[in-house]
């Protein structure tokens, strides 16, 4: 029997989780020194750009004759579905905290789940090489956090390791620098329990899946008890208790970054099974004769929905490869296989789908991925999902933490209370304050841009879903109207220049626009239809000095999330591989007026 340790790594965005795993792989001689510029784990472009881990990866290293399976978890609560299933594979966890920032709200979300399952934590205080960091205070903050999350006595007695993953050292005392990260690996062997070796009929809970064009879907999970062998007949039990008989074609275990084919897998190890059919995440693989299912994973309910529809704008099909409803339908179905917290509902009459997810980030990552693959689609404004609880209409409430310089704190509090938020606590940390609120999810849509503008870009904002509470009343939305293009054509600098006192533009001169496209923000509340395609009429009469150059303020450029949060109820965001345009749902001006009158 090989010795095994299964650990999950929990950390806030950008505290260095993926870097730490890279260094552990270096210690296990998986990577050569020269490969260590790029982060090996964040392997899709989106993750590298945003510095967030969306999908969990599995890696295993050998150390002192023990196999350590490292499971990288997504830190953001929008990916709640991912987090929970991943933690089910681990026996212990490493909580990674920044020596300056301390534990953040999203760390709290994952940590709470880990403590509930009963994982034993090791705390790593990272980035102690940074100036003005405060490792000892952070250590106390972690203790208080665990205490407030109802950790057991045993969990509270956690070992602490200090170090800098980037500079490749870890030590039990932050003042004594070492040369490598072995203190951390030793702590893992010492403090994290080995998986229990349970004899009996085999059981394995499927916690994630992979897809290969050759073998189809591959089930990944941790063998709970017994031994799985290649070629064995098994029973698959799904959530509803229905059974189906199948055969294991191939078994793979994780080794390094890849997988290795094997004949048998013992309890406690993590493996991948090829050859199963029609399984879902949360199903159990069990014995052929007397199947006993494990309890399925509870997954967080979605809290937001968005309308996806085919692109029907005048520029339809110019930039994307996949534009028809059949393409979008297939792509969404494929996403449902992997993305646990997602739900999709097709509109029977039109080519439209309502997609439910955990938050704006969760949905925007899907849209961004589709866009890069060459899809064209339109999305509506994000809507919050309401629930009836005991006959009362309830809405999702989130816990929001904002960290800003003290001068801006009153502005923040004012802005959030106007969005029906209630302030829970406020503590000063040097020149900055940390403020906590409970805010309806509706109030968070579109909040980030305003918070950053009001605090001159200094605010750090994080939020996570808390619970459903009774409806809090109406919230004021964006009050400015839109400037809408009157006719299709090329936008001219001359026209834009003459209209600048009417509001701010989103387009550059010489950009193609179509009638009904939103080209700017009006300074007043009503929508304004303008003609940006007017060019200057040329005559050969010239008075000296009357010819002014057009001077144009640079346009506002939106990121995908900002655009989603910006659009109104009667607008769509058109997303194509090359551009994003906001538009009115009804493009024709007369029809829009008619619809508004009714």
Model-derived segments and their meaning:
Residues 254, 259-262, 394, 439, ...:
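Long insertion/accessory domains within large nucleic-acid-processing enzymes
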Residues 164, 347-362:
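Short glycine/threonine-rich beta-strand-turn micro-motifs
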Residues 120, 130-190:
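Canonical P-loop GTPase G-domain recognition
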Residues 36-41, 149-161, 195-205, 241-254, ...:
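Interdomain boundary/hinge elements
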Residues 203-306, 314-318, 480, 489-539, ...:
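Conserved nucleotide-binding/hydrolysis modules and their immediate coupling elements
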Residues 225-227, 277-278, 357-363, 405-409, ...:
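Helix N-cap motif at beta-to-alpha junctions
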Residues 1-97, 101-103, 137, 141, ...:
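P-loop NTPase switch module centered on the Walker A-proximal segment
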Residues 313-336, 549, 553:
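A short, contiguous, amphipathic alpha-helix enriched in charged residues
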């Amino acid at each position: 029997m090989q010795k095994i340790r299964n650990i999950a790594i929990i950390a806030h965005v950008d505290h260095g989780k993926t870097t730490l795993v890279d260094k552990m792989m270096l210690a296990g001689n998986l990577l050569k020194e020269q490969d260590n510029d790029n982060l090996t784990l964040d392997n899709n472009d989106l993750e590298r750009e945003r510095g967030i881990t969306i999908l969990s990866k599995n890696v295993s290293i050998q150390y002192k004759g023990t196999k350590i399976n490292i499971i990288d978890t997504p830190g953001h609560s929008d990916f709640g579905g991912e987090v929970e299933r991943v933690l089910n594979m681990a026996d212990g966890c490493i909580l990674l905290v920044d020596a300056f920032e301390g534990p953040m709200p999203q760390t709290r979300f994952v940590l709470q789940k880990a403590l509930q399952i009963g994982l034993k934590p090791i705390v790593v205080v990272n980035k102690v090489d940074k100036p003005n960091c405060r490792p000892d205070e952070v250590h106390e903050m972690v203790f208080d956090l665990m205490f407030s999350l109802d950790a057991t006595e045993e969990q509270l007695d956690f070992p602490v390791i200090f170090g800098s993953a980037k500079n490749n050292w870890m030590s039990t005392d932050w003042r004594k620098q070492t040369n490598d990260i072995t203190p951390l690996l030793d702590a893992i062997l010492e403090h994290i329990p080995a998986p229990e070796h349970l004899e009996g009929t085999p059981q394995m809970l499927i916690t994630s899946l992979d897809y290969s064009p050759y073998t189809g879907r591959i089930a990944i999970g941790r063998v709970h008890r017994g031994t799985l062998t290649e070629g064995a007949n098994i029973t698959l039990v799904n959530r509803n208790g229905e059974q189906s008989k199948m055969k294991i074609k191939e078994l793979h275990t994780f080794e390094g970054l890849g997988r290795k084919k094997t004949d048998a897998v013992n309890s406690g190890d993590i493996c991948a099974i090829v050859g199963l059919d029609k399984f879902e995440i949360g199903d159990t693989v069990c014995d052929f004769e007397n199947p006993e299912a494990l309890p399925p994973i509870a997954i967080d309910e979605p809290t937001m929905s968005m309308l996806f529809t085919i692109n029907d704008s005048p520029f339809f099909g110019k930039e994307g490869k996949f534009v028809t409803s059949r393409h979008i339908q297939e792509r969404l179905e494929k996403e449902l296989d992997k993305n646990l917290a997602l739900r999709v509902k097709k509109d029977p009459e039109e080519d439209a789908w309502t997609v439910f997810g955990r938050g704006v980030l969760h949905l925007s990552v899907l849209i961004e991925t589709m866009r890069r693959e060459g899809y064209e689609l339109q999305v509506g404004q994000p809507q919050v999902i309401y629930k009836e609880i005991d006959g009362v209409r309830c809405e999702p409430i989130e816990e929001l933490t904002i960290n800003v310089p003290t001068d801006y704190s009153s502005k923040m509090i004012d802005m959030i209370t106007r969005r029906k938020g209630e302030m829970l606590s406020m503590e000063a940390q040097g020149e900055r304050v940390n403020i906590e609120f409970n805010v309806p999810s509706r109030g968070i849509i579109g909040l980030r841009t305003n918070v950053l503008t009001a605090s001159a870009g200094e605010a750090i904002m994080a939020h996570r879903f808390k619970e459903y509470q009774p409806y809090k009343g109406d919230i004021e939305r964006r009050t400015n109207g839109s400037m809408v293009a009157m006719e299709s054509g090329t936008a001219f600098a001359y026209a834009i220049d003459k209209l600048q006192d009417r509001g701010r533009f989103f387009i550059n001169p010489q950009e193609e626009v179509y009638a009904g496209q939103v080209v700017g923000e009006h300074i007043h509340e009503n929508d304004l239809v303008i003609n940006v395609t007017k060019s200057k009429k040329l005559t050969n009469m010239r008075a000296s000095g009357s010819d002014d150059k057009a001077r144009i303020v640079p346009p506002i450029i939106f990121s995908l999330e900002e655009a989603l949060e910006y659009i109104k109820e009667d607008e769509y965001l058109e997303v194509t591989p090359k551009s994003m345009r906001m538009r009115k749902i009804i493009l024709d001006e007369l029809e829009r007026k008619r619809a508004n009158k009714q």
